Curated annotation (Swiss-Prot):
Family: Belongs to the MscL family.
Molecular function per GO: mechanosensitive monoatomic ion channel activity
Quaternary structure, from the entry: Homopentamer.
Gene3D superfamilies: Large-conductance mechanosensitive channel, MscL, domain 1
Xref: InterPro entries: MS_channel (IPR001185), MSC/AndL (IPR037673), MscL_channel (IPR036019)
Protein name: Large-conductance mechanosensitive channel
GO CC annotation terms, alphabetical: plasma membrane
Keywords tagged on the record: Cell membrane, Ion channel, Ion transport, Membrane, Transmembrane, Transmembrane helix, Transport
Its job: Channel that opens in response to stretch forces in the membrane lipid bilayer. May participate in the regulation of osmotic pressure changes within the cell.
HAMAP family the UniProt entry points to: MscL (MF_00115)
Biological source species: Clostridium beijerinckii (strain ATCC 51743 / NCIMB 8052)
């Protein structure tokens, strides 16, 4: 069982996925910092010194200046400013991933144009076979190279 797990874990896709998750986590921290520390303060300044992380309304009685004051008083709050920050964070991450995938697709398309196809069909039995095969494994016909 350990041997099977080792084979599974060492496959190229599994390692690539693990690397992608680690890099994605680090990238997410960078984007979150960009949104919270650079973009939203600038937007808040342009809108009259609004601090988006402190935009909220209470679901109970009382008048509180900050989210923390309301939480300390035990009053439930709807923190729509933090939600706006998270939406902007998500949009930046989604757009960045879109751009990266688009560029990778362009690169692989250009590289893939000159590659010999992996599969071809046997002209006798129409079975899909390896493009470098000289004999069909299904009908055993000898295949002449094109």
């Amino acid at each position: 069982m350990f041997k099977e797990f080792k084979e599974f874990a060492m496959k190229g896709n599994m390692v690539s996925l693990a690397i992608g998750v680690v890099i994605g986590g680090a990238f997410s921290k960078i984007v979150t910092s960009l949104v919270n520390d650079i973009i939203m303060p600038l937007v808040g300044l342009l809108m009259g010194r609004v601090d988006f992380s402190n935009l909220f309304f209470t679901l109970g009685s009382g008048n509180f200046k900050t989210v923390q004051e309301a939480k300390d008083a035990g009053v439930a709050t709807v923190n729509y400013g933090i939600f706006i920050n998270n939406i902007i964070d998500f949009l930046i991450v989604a757009f960045s991933i879109f751009i990266i995938i688009q560029q990778i697709s362009k690169l692989t398309k250009k590289k893939g144009e000159n590659i010999v196809p992996d599969k071809k069909k046997c002209k006798y039995c129409y079975t899909e076979i390896n493009s470098q095969a000289t004999r069909c494994p299904n009908c055993t016909s000898e295949l002449k190279e094109n």
